[in-house]
């Protein structure tokens, strides 16, 4: 049983012991100085993040899913990352999804006791009909949350890839996962408030994981968001810029190609660069598994 009082996330931060007596600007600078430590902590675990990306990518290539699971702030960060994948990369909402202890309502208010139930973590994943091609990322700043441990154990039992994202190196969750990502951002400015530095570190890591996987899946061309879903005027204008940047085409030509493809950037780019029609561009992209660079190379 983990002694919660000894967790790194529960320690007092000597630098902020008198934060309640500071002028506002000094308070803000103190918080900012502590936040500066987060990027360095994440940098130290880049090899583990890369390993997670490669493992998740391999399974998604086989049709598997990326599933985040967590409680409270950690769970909400998973929901946020999963929710951004469909509009950013046109992924099927079922391919990247999140499960939070306590369900939908826990996004907006605490659900008492949900995080302390191991069986709930397992049962929430059972409802998704998990397979060995799936990847489960358990997010828990303390690395000892029963809900997350139960989820990781169930995922392992069906052969899914398991990844633990914590902020306590050497924590319990590391023994329950195939890959452990445990940066050490240090004690929080407000003791135990893991929505702060720990949450920032977790957000950075989830950004890296989802971005890295999507890049490897061919969802970008260069650094351009060529699979963006043009669901509003801002994003339609972004599509125009993307196509112009990728092809060097004039505004009118880019817009014409996008109108023909219903604002799908990938075929529009191939059409303009290779001089083929929409059907030809789509055929080339299908042969290239949706990768623009490969489609252009023939």
What name fits each language-model region?
Residues 67-204, 213-215:
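Glycine-rich phosphate-binding loops that contact phosphosugars or nucleotide phosphates
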Residues 1-41:
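Cofactor-/ligand-binding subdomain signature composed of acidic, glycine-rich
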Residues 30-38, 98-109, 221, 262:
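Gly-rich Lys/Arg/Thr-decorated short loops/hinges at beta-loop-alpha junctions or inter-strand turns
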Residues 34-44, 110, 135-138:
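Short, basic, glycine/proline-bearing loop/turn elements
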Residues 192-206, 229-242:
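EF-Ts-like protein-protein interaction surfaces
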Residues 213-298:
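Short, amphipathic alpha-helical interaction segments embedded in low-complexity terminal/linker regions
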Residues 44-59:
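A short, well-structured juxtamembrane/interface segment
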């Amino acid at each position: 049983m983990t002694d919660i009082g000894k967790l790194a996330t529960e320690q007092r931060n000597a630098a902020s012991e008198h934060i309640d007596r500071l002028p506002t600007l000094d308070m803000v600078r103190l918080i900012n100085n502590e936040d500066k430590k987060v990027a360095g902590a994440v940098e130290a675990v880049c090899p583990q993040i890369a390993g997670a990306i490669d493992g998740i990518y391999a399974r998604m290539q086989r049709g598997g899913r990326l599933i985040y699971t967590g409680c409270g702030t950690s769970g909400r960060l998973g929901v946020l990352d999963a929710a951004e994948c469909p509009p950013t990369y046109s992924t099927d909402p079922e391919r990247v999804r999140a499960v939070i202890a306590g369900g939908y309502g826990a996004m907006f208010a605490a659900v008492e006791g949900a995080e302390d139930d191991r069986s709930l973590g397992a049962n929430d994943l059972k409802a998704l009909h998990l397979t060995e091609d799936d990847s489960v990322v358990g997010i828990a700043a303390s690395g000892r949350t029963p809900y997350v441990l139960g989820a990781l154990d169930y995922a392992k039992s069906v052969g899914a890839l398991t990844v633990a994202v914590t902020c306590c190196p050497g924590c319990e969750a590391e023994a329950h996962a195939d890959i452990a990502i445990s940066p050490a951002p240090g004690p929080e400015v407000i003791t135990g408030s893991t929505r702060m530095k720990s949450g920032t570190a977790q957000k950075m890591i989830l950004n890296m994981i989802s971005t890295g996987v999507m890049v490897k899946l061919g969802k970008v061309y260069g650094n351009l968001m060529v699979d963006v879903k043009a669901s509003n005027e801002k994003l339609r204008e972004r599509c125009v810029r993307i196509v112009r940047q990728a092809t060097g085409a004039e505004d009118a030509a880019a817009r014409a190609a996008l109108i023909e493809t219903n604002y799908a950037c990938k075929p529009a780019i191939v059409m303009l660069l290779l001089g083929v029609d929409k059907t030809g561009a789509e055929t080339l992209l299908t042969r290239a598994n949706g990768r623009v660079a490969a489609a252009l190379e023939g």
